[in-house]
Structures are given as C-alpha cells and as structure tokens.
Swiss-Prot record:
Catalyzes the biosynthesis of 4-amino-4-deoxychorismate (ADC) from chorismate and glutamine. Required for the synthesis of 4-aminobenzoate (PABA), an important component in tetrahydrofolate biosynthesis. Pathway: Cofactor biosynthesis; tetrahydrofolate biosynthesis; 4-aminobenzoate from chorismate: step 1/2. It comes from Schizosaccharomyces pombe (strain 972 / ATCC 24843). InterPro entries: ADC_synthase, Anth_synth_I-like, Anth_synth_I_N, Chorismate_C, Class_I_gatase-like, GATASE, PabB_fungal, TrpG/PapA_dom. Its main location: cytoplasm. The lineage of its organism: Eukaryota, Fungi, Dikarya, Ascomycota, Taphrinomycotina. It holds the Pfam family GATase. It is found in: Cytoplasm; Nucleus. Signal peptide: none annotated. Residues 266-718 are annotated as: PABB component. This is Putative aminodeoxychorismate synthase.
Length: 718
C-alpha cells in the first residue's frame, strides 16, 4: 500500500463540547500517520453512515447533558465492530448502552479537579498503573453489568469507575478527560488505543480513492474543522510611514484630540507590564468606521472624510477579514506593535453562540441607530507611545508609492494650545469631587437565585462552569466630560489593558486587567483570569498566591485553560499549543488575580482575526462547555451584556493584534444618558450564592467609585 492509504482514518464525534479539539490534537500526537475528521453528533448524515466503516477508529467526545439525549445516534456507534473510545459523555453513553445507570454524583460533581486514578494495567492502560485525571463530570455510571463491561480504572478518592471496556467489542470509555492539561500519561493511553487500529480497516480500504490528506473524497465533505476566512492572502496595497517625534504625554495628547468631539481610539497601558499606548484618530483619507448590527446581519463601512458608506449583507467577521485582506502593508524594520489598521470593540453577543443582539432590528442601520453589536475603526493615522524608553512615533498609512504629509504638526498646533503636561485631567482623583447616582443595581436576592439556577444546571451535567453577570446603571456628574470620567476611573483602577474609545455609536471607559489574545509574527498568546481576591491591609503577593491557589479558583481556571487550548487547537500548528505555567498571580490596585498563559503557533493563511473569531466570546466570560453555557445564561441575565464581556483592541495592517477582555469598565450608547457597568463571576459547584454576589459587588466597585460616592450610604451599591 502507499503511504497515504496506510494512514489511520479517525472519526472524532463532537457533542458540542469545548474540549473536542484538545482530543483532536492528542490523536495527532498519538499517531504520526493519523488523519482525523470532526463531525457534530447530530449532523451524521445517511451518507456518512454508509461510509462509516472506512474509519479505522472512532472517538466519541465529551459533551453537556445526559447521555440518553444522544442515544439515537451514539447507540449505533456501539454496534460497530471497530475500535471506539468514548470520553466522559462518550464513556457514559457506552455504559448506558450496556445497561448501567447514569446518575448524579453521590456527593458534589468534579469540575476542574484532578483525581488519582488506579488502573488495571491492561488494554489501553497497558504499562500504566496509575494516572492523574482531570475530572469534568456531574454524572457517573452505576450498576455496571460485569458480564458486558470490564472495569479498567477507578478513582482513589471516591472509588468511582473511571474507565471501562466492552467485553465483546474493542470499545473503551474514560470518564475523566485525558486531553486536559491536568491529566497525565494520556499520550501513552491513546497510543495503546490506536494500536488496535494500526492496520487500516480491511473491509473497505481498497474501495475508495484517497485524497492527499489521507481521506477518501467521500469523507472530506463531512469534516467541520475550521479554516481561515481568506485562503489566499492579498498583496500589500498600503505603505507605512513611521516617524519619531518629540515626546508628549499620551494622556495629554489624547485629551487634546478628544476635545474636538471626533471619534478616537486610545489604548492606554496605564500599568506595567504594558509598554505601549496607542492613539488612533480618524482624520485621514483612508479612515473608515465599520459597525455591525447582528439583528439584521448587516455590516456598514463608512468613509470618514465624506460620510459616504456601503452596507454589506454579511457578518462582521467575514466582512472585516475581506476588508483587511485588501488593506495590508509590509512590516518595517521598527519593532512597534501597531502601524495602522483596525481598532475598536466587538460586543459579547457578536457570535453565533448567543441568540441575543443589542442592536435594534426595527431601525435601519445608520447614524440614528443607538446601539450596535460591534464598532471598529480603520485607522490610517496613529501615535504609538513607547512608555519604557519615552519615545513617540507617528504613523501614517498611504496607498503604495504615495508621499506622506506632516499632518501631525498642524494637528498638534491647532489642538494642543495648552501646555500638555499641565492639564487638569491629569490630576489624581481624590474622591472629593462631584458624583452621579446609581440608577439601578442588581438585587441580591435575584442574583443569588440566579446563582442557584446555574448550580442546578451544573448538577445536571449541562455545564462545568457558568459565568453569571449583571448590569448596574449609573449617571455621571453632568459637568464632567466623558474623558474626565475616564481619568477618574483610571486614577482609581489603573490597568494594563485600559482604554478610552469614542466612535459613532458608543463611548467606552475601560480599566481591564485581562488580555484576551495577543498575536505577534506567528505566535499567539491567551491570558485568562479566574479568581479574584480583594486587597486588604498589608497583604503580600505571596499571601495572595496562597489564598488564590484554592480548589475553587484553580478549578475555575483549569476549565478555562482547557477551553482556550481547545480554541487554539482548531487553528494552531500541530504540537505548538502549550502552557508553560498553569497558575500565576498578578497584583492590581484593588485586587489580586489568578491567571494563566496559553501559547500557540499560527501559520499563514490563518490570521489573528481567524483565531479571534473562533475563540470569541472570551471563555473566561462564558463558562464551559461554551455553547450550552451561553444559551443557559441568557434567560438568567436580565440585560444583554453588549460591550461588556466583549473585546477591545487592534488588528494591524502587518498582521499583529492584541485584544483585551472588556471588564472593569463602563460604557454608554449614543442615545443613553446613563452608563452601564457589567460585573459577575464564574459560578461553580463549589460557589456559594452569597459569595458570588459579593464577588460581583467587588468587581463592580472597581469602577463605580468614579461615578458614585460609595461612602454615602444612600448611594451605596449595596
């Protein structure tokens, strides 16, 4: 046989889980000659069933809910005499098929917690006596029939069956998640499993022609593995002009420019380790504003210089990908993060996962529209501040071979007629100035009931973690400008990923400490935060670390680490996703945070935008599995999140990108006379309703003092 015809063909069944592509990666690591296609469990067409015996092995992935929900499809899998591995839900489905009962855990579910597992040292555990297994399950298999199922592994802590094998067929199940970053010896387990399928399926291997990737042409059409938006990269159409000019304080320049009332995007590294601040303005001939209304699936691109526009009946993600493919530039020798390109926000609901939209479908998408689901600017003129070495660069994008005028000199002369380092907006906020009022704050009893509702979903196996949020509505003192309100918030809560953004339909005051995604060259980085501790007294960083490294907070972060690994594995180069350090603790002005860093390599034609779209909304703001969690949260949250829980950042014309998670922030839409402040936390099975409410209050209070005097009991958020 040829090399291609000898490649193992593996079917991976996705049950709409957020860890499926971690299994995808593990399968490729376990067999260099594997070819894996991924299908949704409920999209297995009659044609696929006719081709099913082409596969040398099948893996049934994890998923939410009870396995009985999937029996109409998965029971047919258990009738096949080919190697099959079921993970978590797949394990439960195999056990249920053979007559076991699937019940709720006798004590609490295990979500994001590592268990010690003792094995039989046989079959898939050949050569393995014990493993560490990351457990994400609310249900377990009881009354296992020993005549049809053999027990291969059990947990040491609670004696729960962790692995089984069918006695008559090469069918295996593992209840814990071997694909998790917290599980051990998983590569050996999967190598043992795939050794059963090492000889291609002789029933059909000669019946179908193979394509270059090892699949028959029949099988290729079933694969749901994501691809890049743009498969052929466009040629550069722009050139970059970058000039160093004398240093100006970024806050002072931002204040001068924003006073014109024109759109502005200011990404403010208000705290180390942030090194660069970026100020984008929309006065150039190439400047555009792009906004998206999900309710009508319409994207508008408006030319700033003459206010003309085009409306495109397509989603934001595809439209922006196509736009940026036509607006590319070759990176110069300087090593700056941004030279021009897309800046702005993408709201939480701006994905297919959410059924909601904050845009109003009853109005056409124009300047009268008060809310949009996303709004971005294409910035052709920008300032980049290197805060570490106090250097300022001014950037201009022009069409190829066009010269660049010194537009910044006129701008600075006309707008900055006040001494830049002596502006009132730079003075620290001391809490003695005027305040606004809280218009509405989440009621404790309502929020606590929502926490309990989340936990019922967790007990039922529908989710491992649900990130519940709510919204506070607050007014600002009328005599203060939006930028002055930003300066208040920044003074109280300086953050690495802060920003002030005002576009046609919204204003955002952002004090976020959390990076969502960073993309440099071919390297991608995610930095989720889970676990928040209030700074009190003289608490040291080491003391905070000891308190944050508890079972609940580590469990929350474990779930999101694995979720982000899954998102990256969809597009990253094989074997490139890694987590050098599972847990880190960062110090902020009001709180300590537990976080992790997840890395991966991305190869052309895949872009930062592709990775962003496949990982949006941020997993740290949804829970896991992401789809089921988002849908279950929607009826529990009284208001659409809008900009909160979305992302603010940039995608540069050279391909670089960085986006935050919009938390610790306030925003208002164009027609609003009030501000919205979102806050919440990850509900796990170890949460207490009162504790979750207090965490939500703590996070809201990171931004509320800029608006409200919390020392005045009548105005207190509690």
């Amino acid at each position: 046989m040829s090399e291609i015809s000898n490649r193992l063909q593996i079917l991976l069944i996705d049950c709409y889980d957020s860890y499926t592509f971690n299994l995808y990666d593990l399968l490729y690591k376990a067999s260099e000659n594997a070819c894996v296609i991924v299908v949704h469990w409920d999209k297995m067409s009659p044609d696929l069933w006719e081709d099913i015996l082409q596969f040398d092995a099948i893996v049934v992935g994890p998923g939410p809910g009870h396995p009985a929900e999937y029996s109409s499809i998965l029971n047919r899998i258990w009738q096949l005499n080919i190697p099959v591995m079921g993970i978590c839900l797949g394990f439960q489905s195999l056990a249920l098929y053979h007559g076991a009962t699937i019940e709720r855990m006798p004590n609490l579910p295990w979500h994001g917690r590592v268990s010690s597992v003792t094995t039989s040292k046989t079959f898939i555990f050949d050569g393995i006596s014990a493993v560490k297994g990351m457990r994400y399950h609310s249900l377990y298999a009881n009354k296992i029939p020993i005549d049809s199922l053999q027990i291969l592994a059990q947990s040491d802590e609670d004696n729960i069956v962790m692995s089984i094998k069918a006695t008559k067929f090469p069918h295996f199940g593992i209840l814990y998640h071997p694909e998790s970053v917290g599980s051990s010896k998983s590569l050996k387990i999967f190598k043992n499993f795939l050794s059963l399928a090492d000889t291609p399926n002789i029933q059909c291997v000669n019946s179908f022609s193979k394509s270059a990737n090892g699949f028959s042409h029949n099988l290729n059409r079933y694969d749901i593995s994501p691809a890049a938006f743009i498969l052929k990269s466009g040629s550069p159409s722009l050139q970059i002009h970058s000039v160093e000019i004398p240093w100006v304080e970024p806050l002072a320049l931002a204040d001068c420019i924003q006073k014109s009332g024109n759109p502005i995007c200011f990404l403010d590294s208000a705290k180390k380790p942030g090194r660069y601040s970026i100020l984008g303005i929309l006065t150039g001939p190439l400047a555009r504003i792009i906004h998206y209304e999900k309710a009508t699936n319409t994207t508008e691109i408006r030319i700033c210089k003459d206010n003309s526009f085009v409306r495109i009946n397509n989603d934001l993600w595809s439209t922006v990908a196509d736009f940026m493919n036509q607006h590319k530039a070759i990176k110069p020798d300087t090593n700056l993060p941004f030279y021009g390109g897309i800046m702005g926000i993408i709201g939480y609901e701006c994905s297919d996962l959410s059924t909601k939209s904050v845009s109003n479908a009853s109005f056409p998408l124009d300047f009268q529209q008060t809310t949009v689901d996303a709004e971005l600017a294409f910035v052709d003129r920008s300032f980049v501040f290197d805060l570490e070495i106090k250097k300022l660069f001014v950037q201009t994008l022009t069409p190829l071979n066009e010269t660049c005028s010194e537009w910044w000199g006129e701008l600075l002369a006309s707008t900055c007629n006040t001494k830049l380092d002596n502006l009132s907006c730079l003075h620290s906020f001391d809490g003695k100035q005027n305040f606004g009022l809280v218009q509405s704050f989440p009621k404790k009893e309502v929020y606590c009931e929502s926490v309990k509702a989340c936990q019922e979903h967790l007990l039922a196996g529908d989710s491992y973690e649900m990130c519940l949020t709510d919204t506070t509505f607050v007014s600002a003192p009328p005599e203060l400008s939006d930028f002055e309100m930003y300066m208040r918030a920044r003074s109280l809560n300086p953050a690495t990923f802060a920003g002030f953004v005002r576009l046609n339909h919204f204003t955002l005051l952002c004090c976020s400490p959390e990076r969502f995604l960073q993309f440099r060259d071919d390297r991608c980085l995610f930095s989720p935060i889970k676990g928040t501790l209030k700074r009190e007294g003289h608490m040291s960083l080491e003391e905070a670390r000891k308190k944050l490294l508890n079972e609940k907070d580590m469990g929350e972060l474990n779930m999101i680490i694995d979720l982000i690994r899954n998102d990256l594995h969809q597009l990253a180069k094989k074997n490139s996703v890694h987590v050098p350090e599972l847990y880190s603790v960062e110090e902020h002005s009001n709180v300590y945070s537990l976080l992790s860093n997840i890395y991966g390599r991305i190869e052309s034609p895949i872009t930062a935008w592709d990775v962003l779209s496949k990982s949006f909304p941020p997993g740290s703001m949804t829970g896991a599995p992401k789809l089921r969690s988002v849908r279950m949260l929607e009826p529990l949250e009284q208001h659409g999140r809008g900009i909160y829980s979305g992302t603010l950042g940039y995608w540069d014309v050279t391909g670089s990108a960085e986006f935050n998670v919009i938390i610790r922030s306030a925003f208002k839409y164009k027609a609003d006379d009030y501000w919205r402040i979102g806050a919440g936390g990850a509900v796990t099975i170890l949460s207490s309703p009162e504790g979750e409410y207090e965490e939500m209050v703590l996070k809201a209070n990171s931004i509320l003092p800029a608006f409200v005097n919390l020392k005045n009991k009548k105005r207190s958020c509690k």
